[in-house]
């Protein structure tokens, strides 16, 4: 008896997880299968844990984030240009006094 | 005496030459025949010889345009052919691009639209056990169908379960839940067998 799992990702490549559930001697086959299920849970947790981490890293390295950063820089430039415009009137005020 | 004879021979030779040259072209032949008649009338005058030599040049000049026309006609054809070839050359890359771009886009689209899949096969001892497990697990899985698609199949004594989703996190949650429930189902099956054995034992003791 073998408890098997297969994962197919975006690339279409299958990855298999296998757990042997051979009953030893007079042991109950269902008992062996239950032990196999426990082992499969461990494998699944390990496998998908790695997969989730890779997915998170992929999102972190997304080029769109860089573009978002550029947008922020552009916003700051606009703010600076606004400040420059606000300095204009203050420079003109001394002229009426003379 | 011989001189007049030689002169006649020369004229005859010229006439033959003109005829041979003009035979391929009927209009030129007629013109040359008229000229030859005139030449016959003025044959006594030696000055007419240079003029005669000049006149045959005209057919040559006429022939030249014909010869030019012959190579001229293929050249436009060649141009048309080269144009067609150019068009074909231009079209082929375009068609190739057309065939490649959809392929690339198709690959990209298929890659983007491809769902994640996970399947588990559980080998029970009997078809009855597999059926019992399937019925129990299907009922428990219904609330999760909204987020993750699950498919349960019992083939003889083999239970096969397949998940389809886009999010690996949901995968882990759903599969772990399934495995926990599977363990519970197996325990229940064992207990049912135990109860059955006990009942059989009691029946035998009563009979005895």
Curated annotation (Swiss-Prot), chain A:
One of its GO terms (cellular component) is nucleus. Residues 55-98 are annotated as: Disordered. Pfam families: DUF4611. The keyword Heme does not apply. GO terms for biological process: tRNA threonylcarbamoyladenosine modification. Keywords: Acetylation, Nucleus. It is found in: Nucleus. This is EKC/KEOPS complex subunit GON7. The gene is Gon7.
